[in-house]
């Protein structure tokens, strides 16, 4: 079983965790409808990069 040799300080723990935070999702405005959507994702009404890709 793995057991640590020496205790890691709060500072070292914090330094290790400094890159773990999540960033906010990148949003873009659709050229045809002006709707906000996530990057590289189809909008709610079925448009992707200005073209209709999903017919509902």
From Swiss-Prot:
GO terms for molecular function: structural constituent of ribosome. One of its GO terms (cellular component) is large ribosomal subunit. Residues 1-39 are annotated as: Disordered. InterPro entries: Ribosomal_bL32, Ribosomal_bL32_bact, Ribosomal_zn-bd. Residues 21-31 have a biased composition (Polar residues). Keywords: Ribonucleoprotein, Ribosomal protein. This is Large ribosomal subunit protein bL32. It comes from Shewanella piezotolerans (strain WP3 / JCM 13877).
